Structures are given as structure tokens and as C-alpha cells.
Amino acid sequence: MKKKIVYICALFLIITPFLYAQHAIGSWQNHLSYHNVTRTEPAGNLIYAIGNGSLFSYDKEDTSIQCYWKGNLLSDTDISYIAYNKEYKTLIIIYSNANIDLLVNDKEVYNLPDYMNKNMIQTKNVNHICFAKEYAYLSTSFGVMVLNLKKREIANTYILNKKINACAVDDAKIYAASSEGLLTGLLTNNLLDNNNWNKVSDIIYSFLSIYNDTLIGNISYQGIYLINRSDYSYSQLIGGYYSFMYTYEDKLIASNENSLALFDNINKIYYLDHYLGIAHLSYENGIYWSAGQEKGLVGMKFDTTNKSLETIVSSIIPNSPKRNLTYRMKFEGEKLFIAGGGKTSQPEEGTIMIFENKIWNSFQEKEIAEQTGISYRNISSIAQDPTDEKRHFASSITQGLYEFYDKKFVKHYTYNNSPLEVAVPITNPEIYKDFVRINGLTYDNDNNLWMTNYEVKHFIHVLKPDGKWVNLHYPEVDTTISLENIIFDKRGWLWATAWGYNYGVFCLNTKNTLEDPGDDQHKFVTNFINQDGTLLSHKKIYCIVEDKNGVIWIGTAQGPIILNNPSNFFKDDFYCTQIKVPRNDGTNLADYLLVSDEITAIAVDGGNRKWIGTGSNGIYLLSPDGLETIHHFTAENSPLLSNNIQSIAINSNTGEVFIGTNKGLLSYQSDAIEPKDSFVDDDVYAYPNPVKQDYAGVITITGLMMDTDIKITNVSGKLIYAGTSVGGQFTWNGRNLQGNKVPSGIYFVLAADKDGKQSIATKILIIK
């Protein structure tokens, strides 16, 4: 059992868990989604809730919210079940991978990974939890697992080789509702021996509870029943279909799709209709707490006069992304845009999210399908109009092109009102509209909006500022090819990656004559030759970027390949480079960089370093030339949510690196920002300043030029520290060249550009 203790600062709802004045370099920030609340658990002053598989709590006294995640307290991600025990002040947290956390007193976590690590043929779902004395009984896909909350350990595992839907425990027996009928066992017997379990009924109950000293069972699609504990006969208490049934304090609560049954006791039941969208309902001290899905966490009191639930706390949803979707991300100035879903086997809800001024918002989703007559889904890219920051276009991998203004839907472009083409030769128009496959939205320097159209003749379309269209076709890119990502390099050349039947890279130079394709240079390459003359048959190509030196980096299924001289791409003797990393083992041998990794995302930071995302091995930070690995973050050695990286976007002004994974979004505060073109007095400064005795982080000097030479001296002019900026920023650990902490005093920072033509100075006060 692993124990982790973290003290979390209460965060008010209007402040949110993501709002910080300045992130410390090297720190991680949480951007998980906490929408779609599916379960609630009262715990005294706190109400715990699961939103999109993540845990948050609401404090009834000060209305603050705490968001819990792997980076501040928890051991894992993607929560499937929670249950709270008042006596031991313990929240049991079950993750989808069967990992278990015990959150005690809201500040201590005891991790129980044994169940997750156990090799089993059966699935490891936890279907229900009930409590008796110091024990928690977990109903699983194979039997019953018992936790000792006092000792904070797994006490027993009863392998019954059948699914257990729910358990109930009284002073003498355990009752287990299995997929084959009702089982019982005496608590005084050795229940590890299956012979000590008895099947007492063939009735399959979906839920069990001890309520008013009576065993209650729910039979799916039939109703709730009283069960005689002597002969296990049963009699109906109420009829109907109920999707859940739980006991809280002196209340029994049952619900179906649109109504509730609230028990004051067995003989006093209130039936409430028209309560749609309640995924779970709990109760404590006169207040019902609803998991209202998209409505969030809702607190309600029962009005005995009107026989209804009256809302007293409404729509508690932490400021967070609407969904844990991160298919494509990009920054426009200080605004982060996320296109949620692209080429997936499962359709994703149409999702465009924006993070601006530390607040998350979403573009309109409701009523788009009604207005267009087609489902709104699979948003694959987004582009902001350079002439009007309120106008945006979004592509769908299946439904064409959407236009928005001020986040509101304006127009839908598809095969029957624009040049966009249908991917397959289908004669049924009703099916046509699901095959207008658009991606790669990008503006060029002339404010033309470029996009790719999958598996059609005119695979590139351009929407000009005047509303006219240009449709491009080149013979080497046939209808089996799907161009995906588009970038424009410093020369204005277009580069695009292709996936599907033929993976490769397409390059186009229009020579600034967009509407005259006769003078265009264009080439599609599927097989690259590296610097050693080796033919590389990369079956998959995922991403493409240009770095600050004009070098093109391409992410493939066998590591990155580099185009050091992209201007030679159209030549017959063109070749790519695979970076060779020396082994430094005395053999003079070297290995190709990350050749065993799928490179799914690449981003370039202010220091021209490369952030490399992989499909199964986390994220790397590489030096500008790729020869040095500065960081390698994985889900095992960092708060990274998953090793499956889908997208990366960097705020060039702050250095914050946003990392999209298949389990959601988080960010890392890097030490590199975009460099300045020249030194400006007000822009060059150090923080924190003064540096107080209790500060343990690095001191940052910002506002610098690329590769600024830094010298730090004391008041006597003695050199204390020296180095080179990373992009527009330099960090100092407060130590001298010998590695010792410097004493109190004033320290001067002398900065000069790499050519020695510009210089500037600032100072730092250190107080011990």
C-alpha cells in the first residue's frame, strides 16, 4: 500500500482550479473535464462528485470547489465509482483500470494497486460497494472483494466465478446478488471456501440494500421487492423499472429514466415524475444531491407540500474543458483552441473548446444538427480569420465545413452548396452528407483559408477572402489519398501529411499565383531516402512542423525524419535525415532518434527545442538539434495522464506546454518562451524579486533575445553564475558556479545578445 499526503488549497468556484498568477517552472496544471456529473457522495461539509471520470468536491459552507487529479493527490485517472464511509471518513475511489485509492479526511491517499495488478481472465469491474463495520464489500465481475478501512488494506477476495451485481450485509450474513441468483454466506464461516456460500434463490437482483432492518432488492424492469431473510421469498413493494437503488441515512432512493421514488420508510414513498437526466441521487442532512450529468452537481430539498424537489444549489461544474477530447490543438495569440474529434472509429460529439484568460468555453453545439439536417460531430480542425478574431471555421471529418461567429453557428458548407466533394460514389443523397471529409484548416499570408478534402479529385480547396473558391488537383495525389495536416513554411510553401491507403508528404509551391496552377511546383513522396542512402518505407506519417531555422520535422511510426534543406524537396537527389544519437559507450556507434516510437505530435518551443509526443511512450523534450533528451515524461514518472499523446500546443508568450492525451488535457510550465527581437528595459526583469528565504524554486529572467549570454555578478563584480537563455528566458537556481546557495544581497544580471551588439542589465535582491 502506497500512501500520499497532499494539502490542497480550497479554490472558490469563481476562481477555479486552473487559475494561478504565475505557474512555477516545472509545474503541472490540471485541465481535465469535470462536466457530465454521474455520481455524488455526501461527506459532511463536502459533496464529492464524478464528472467525466474525474473527481471534485463542493464545500457546502464556503461554496469552494476542489478538483482532484493525478498531479495533486490521486494515484490514477478515469474514475468509474466512488463510495463514502462516514465512520472512517474515507472515500473509496475505483478507477477504470481497477486501481483503488482510499481518500481519508480529504487529504491523505492510500493506494491499493493489488487488484489492478492481479492477472485475471475476468474483467475487473466494480459494480457496487456497501459497508458494514470497518469493512467495504466490493461487488465485482468475479465475486466479492473486501477492504478493511481501519487497516487500509484488501482483507479478503471471494472468487465466486460469477458476476456480483450488489451486496448487502447484516449482523450475521452477507447477501450477494449474482448473475445466477441470490447467494448468502455466514460471516462467521470461511467465505474463501466456495462451499460456504449458498444459492438461496434464482431471482436475479440488480441492487440490494438493508433498509429499515429489511432486505430490499431491485429486479430490473419489474420493481423493488421485500426479501424475507428466512426463506428468501419476495413480495413487490413498488413496480416499474429502476436503474439504481441506494440507501443514504434514513432514505432509500430509486430512480429510472424520468422519475424518482423517495422512501421516508417502507410505508411512506414519494413518487416524483419528470426528473430527466439524473444519473445518480444521494442524500445527507435533508438535502438530496443530484448527479445531473450536463447540469452538473445540484442540491435539492424535498418540498412536502408540493411533493417535489426544489433546487437550492444549482449547476456546480468546475471551470474545465467540456470533454476530454484533444484531437487537434492550436494557439491564436493567448487563446487555445481545441478541435475535439477527428478520424476515429467511434463518432465524437461536435466539440470546439477555447481556453482564454484562464476560462474554458465551448462553441455552440445545440441546434446545429436541427438547422443543418445532419449530425454535428467529428470536428477535426479549426482556424481563426486573421482579419476578424470572432470568425472561425471548423472542419468535420465527415460532415463538411462549419462557420462560426462569436462562437455561434453561422453556416454549413457541404457538397450541395459549395465545391466540397463527397468521398465515395454513392447515389443516395441521404448518405452523401456523411462523406464530405474535411480537415487541415489553415490560413496563408494572403488570408486564404486552405483545407483538405479526403479521397476526392480536388483534394485541396481554398476559400478566398471575397468568398470565391479555388479547387486544386494534382495527378500524383489520387482519390485513395487523404491529406490531413497542412502547414505553410517561411517561404509560403504548403506541406501536408497524408494517411489512409497511401501515407506520405505532399509539398506545393504556388509561386504566389493561386489561381494559375500551370506554374506550380508539387510533389508527393511516400518513400524517403535518408542520408545513408537507406530507403525508408514509413507506413504511417502523423504530423509535420517547421522549426525556427526553417527545418521541417515529420513524425512517423518509426521516429522523426528531418528535412534540413526543404528547398531541395523538388530535386531528384533530395534526401531526408534521421538523427543519429551517439551511444557514448566507447563503440562509436549511434542509434536513430526514437526509431522505435510512433511520433504522433511535434511542437517547437521558444528555444527551438522539440516537444515530441508518442503513441505509447509519453512525451520527450529534445534539444534544438535533437541529440539531447532534456526530459522524458511518462505516465509512470510524472503526472502525465497517459502515454498516448494526441496533440501538443505551446503558448509562446508564457512557455506553457499543453499536452493532449487520450485521457484528457494537462499542461507543463516550461522554461522557454518566444525570444524578443531586441532588449526593452521594461520587458527585461527577474521574478520572483525579491527572492525570500522560503522560496525554493528557480529565479527567472525574462524578456531576452534568442541565445542571450547571461552573467550574474555580486556587487563587487565577481562572477557568480553564467549561461545562455532558452529562447527569451533564463532560469537560475540561486547557486554559484560551485553549486552553493548564494548569500543575501543584490545580484546584477548582465545580458548580451549572441552577437554582442545589444546588452541590458537588471538586478535581483535575495533575502535569507
Predicted regions and their residues:
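Carboxylate-rich, polar loop motifs that coordinate divalent cations or form catalytic acidic clusters
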Residues: 21-684, 719
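A short acidic/small-residue loop/turn micro-motif
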Residues: 648, 725-729, 766
